[in-house]
Amino acid sequence: MKDYNTDMPETHGNNTSPTFHIGSIPIYGDAILSPMDGFSDWPFRSICRGLGSAMSVTEFVKDKFIIHALEHIERRFKYDEAERPVAFQIYGDDPDELLEAALRVQELKPDIIDINMGCPAKTVAHSGAGVGLMRTPLKVARIFRKLSAALEIPVTGKIRIGWEDYRSYKLIARIVEENGGAAIAVHARTKEQGYGGEANWDVIAEVKAAVKIPVIGNGDVKVAADIERMKAYTGCEAVMIGRAAVGNPWIFARLDRSQVPPEAVRQMVHQHLERHMAFYGVRIGMMLFRKHAMQYLKLQRLPRATRTRILLQENAEDFLAALDEIYTGLEIQSETSLRL
């Protein structure tokens, strides 16, 4: 019987040749979990990596926090060897501080350092970091020149289209490449779009035509078929998947949620919650897991009252008991329908 929670996708998990390289780092596979603040922590990354995500990228961390309080935020850089290649994503607006931060976290032995130039949040962008850097191309050049010269590992960047009044994506991509960047990921939305509206895949294709380093596309990959569709449309080497993976980590195994049996979902919720509680502690782990639980249950298309009953359980034992009761019934229904 197929194990939906551990089987690697046949076309990628058994590859002997890399799909592409980031600097000297071989990447096996073409679908990657996107870094997402509040979501791409070790529990979720490790699950997605096990299902076929080609590498792991951490949640972003501000350079000043790394310099002045690394011991308090080091958990964000937690990874295990099975996740490699691992990229640490950092952000800031000062080239010297980003360099100092990168040198410090390099000691934790990631494979890659990634610079966030795409976060649209006001607190980040309007301080000149995240997508705010896309308004300052000379600063981007200094950042990549300094880091690529000083670090022993590849440096990459993640960008957006830019701002509605300053769409600098091709300029920034060329600057990243010319100043030592080893790859670039492109979220095909503007700062103002945030995470809404339609992603413009033409932008990814334009960046791919403008640079020789690997390009990773991001935006509106919602179902498994979109992975190949984006690659064919844009020519990008790989695809990043963010929100569509929350509640459906099986997308990295080229499965849509409708293809995953209820019992596999039930087992995954157990596994994911256990990792959350082991990582954060029982109380905080349960609290932080609710946002994942909501998506697992929402995508099961359960009645709202049923979802609410499960989500309102205050402790892990009661939550899992309510979950098991519902999913056992779903599995029986699924088996019955298959026999009919």
Regions found by a protein language model. Name each.
Residues 36-38, 61-63, 91-93, 118-120, ...:
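Active-site beta-loop-alpha junctions enriched in small/polar residues
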Residues 20-32, 64-85, 119, 124-127, ...:
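N-terminal small/glycine-rich loop or linker at the start of catalytic domains
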Residues 31-34, 56-58, 86-90, 113, ...:
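Hydrophobic faces of well-ordered beta-strands that scaffold small-molecule active sites
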Residues 1-23, 27, 31, 37, ...:
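Alpha/beta catalytic cores of nucleotide-metabolism and tRNA/nucleoside-modifying enzymes
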Residues 128-134, 256-259:
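Short glycine-enriched, charge-decorated loop/helix-capping segments at active-site entrances
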Residues 99-129, 138-213, 233:
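Alpha/beta enzyme core
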Residues 4-21, 36-111:
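Glycine-rich, positively charged N-terminal anion/phosphate-binding segment
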